[in-house]
Amino acid sequence: MLLRLVAEVISTAAAASIDARAPGRARMHLDRALTFAGLSRDVEATYHVWNHMFLAASQQENHAEAVAGAEVMKRSSIARRDPLYASLGHMRNANGLARLQRPSEALRALKDAERAFARADDQERAEWMGFYDSSEFDALSSFVWAALGNHGRAEYSLHRTLASIPDGMTRNRALYTAHLALSQAKQGELELACATGRQAFGLLPSPSGSQRTANTLAATRKVIVTSGSRAAEVAEWIEESGQWI
């Protein structure tokens, strides 16, 4: 029990490093966390560390390593016992494969994630797994579609996310609204993307807001600026967004 707690504490520090966009520091924490999780022989704690390993590798754009971590997740004993853990492992795998531009494998993994998610029940699980609900499933699916260049499917998934996201999760709603704006911009729906981007910014609880949301809005703005559109609404949003991006 003590070794598991140590692993969880170190994993929490790693998660904070990932949020701070310091994947190198996160990896240092995760190497230690993996050691303690292994010594504890707790398969759930080990799975949790590998989930963070995937995120840290993805943040460094080391997608081959991220896929290797996802393979460990989906083949773990807890994934064999519980379809929800299997689904998350397949979903992480799909995202990594999509970023490696391996579309057939990515879509197969996404389908596996969908099948496993449909089999999952409401049994008691570790608290951290509570994030992986239907709204998050659709959000992560949208990232697969976006990485494969299918921004229409990404937009569809994000609309599903925003329709089912729990009340009170304002930061998540802001983030996924920003991703919706980005998918719209990449389809050439510039005026709509501007309106959606403005909505995302309005959801942020403070001017500093969320770095992930700000980064996504910055990517949206870049797409819109690059388009060269001279539409009045687009020009207005470019000027306005420059003050808070």
Report the location of each language-model feature:
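Conserved binding/catalytic microenvironments
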Residues: 1-245
